[in-house]
């Protein structure tokens, strides 16, 4: 039986999960929920099902795999990664994955907070000012490695790709000063399963955020 991934019909938090499902050749189907237009941004399509799915902490995204029902995007990623040995093989690799997972969420939500804020135009310059320093840290962390944990890909690379790519959409050219990050971005998109997915009708690059965001990526 295929897994079911539930999320809004946007990129949001789901792209790393979608890409990991594709990369691992996992049989899955998507349940995409649509949010209504302004001014009410109706969420009834999700809310009508929210408490009927048997989820311990009902939220989007969710993943249903038989009797296993998960919410929280990183918990879902780790669940899938454990099935395929993509959590790091050595203690050093697992430490790097753990650090990245949490650091990326910090940086992800810094962008989210700017883009959903009614004070977007006031907050954007400060975000742009601090972005090069954040990217420099990722560049130093990667160094000359092909993947962020080491020689082999892990689920953390799916998170890094997503955060870097969202920032590329927000600030075109922001990776130009960091050749190893640009190379990583190209390397990731060049993975055969990822490349095929990105060419398919299932792939959602934008909108990055929901309609109620000030900046959605479109």
Curated annotation (Swiss-Prot):
GO terms for biological process: glutathione metabolic process. Glutathione binds at residues 7-8, 46-50, 59-60, 72-73. InterPro entries: Glutathione-S-Trfase_C-like, Glutathione-S-Trfase_C_sf, Glutathione_S-Trfase, Glutathione_S-Trfase_N, GST_C, GST_mu, GST_superfamily, Thioredoxin-like_sf. It is found in: Cytoplasm. Well expressed in rabbit liver, brain and kidney. GO terms for molecular function: glutathione transferase activity; identical protein binding. Residues 2-88 form the GST N-terminal domain. One of its GO terms (cellular component) is cytoplasm. Substrate binds at residue 116. Gene3D superfamilies: 1.20.1050.10, Glutaredoxin. Conjugation of reduced glutathione to a wide number of exogenous and endogenous hydrophobic electrophiles. Belongs to the GST superfamily. Mu family. This is Glutathione S-transferase Mu 1. It comes from Oryctolagus cuniculus (Rabbit).
